[in-house]
Amino acid sequence: MGLKLNKGSSIRLAKDDDNLSEVTIGCSWGEDGHNIDVDAMVFFSDDRSKYRLVDLVYYGNREEGRLYVKHYGDDTTGSNKQHASDNEVIFLRLDKIPERITSVAVVLNAYTGEKLSLVPNLRCRVYSGKPGEVQDVLGTFDINDKKSLTTTSVLVGYFEKDSVNEWSFRAVGEALKAHRVEQLKNVFNTPKNIDIQNDYNTGPVESKVTIWGFIKRLFS
């Protein structure tokens, strides 16, 4: 089952003090009766260059020869469990991710435009090993906070590489006010800024910060 993650929880991606090279993010949800098409996607960013978006992988832009990531397909109804309990699965080779990439955000997006609150039992788990070959479930995050599901997209969490090239995963569970792929790309690509006070109702803060700046503040 692994560690049950809450908002802000962080897990180190290592086993017996050795860094893991292969991890999988598996996301699951129930059938909703509304034919809502939920998509799992990952955004690769270079935060040493002010969080510039480097790569994006989702159902419409899968592995295409990349050595470090593979998206295992699109479940359009919530009824197609690909690997055990997962509807959509993304596999990462952490040791093959280009050095300049330091953050990998995991997002769930309702392609058909409905609020995610209509989708039951949203859950993501991080485990070591390839899809279908689970070694250890490292953490499971149930995304059931209604404030996180008021829009069509939610930032599930992110993988982050530190200064000594060790990776960790942090659960976030924050709603994103973006729907289409191009809108989501803008969220994760500076110099595009977001108005945190208006968009996220977090109270007085500096008027403009990047999405990554916002995330760091939540858990600093």
Residue ranges and their predicted role:
Residues 1-219:
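Intrinsic-disorder/low-complexity signal
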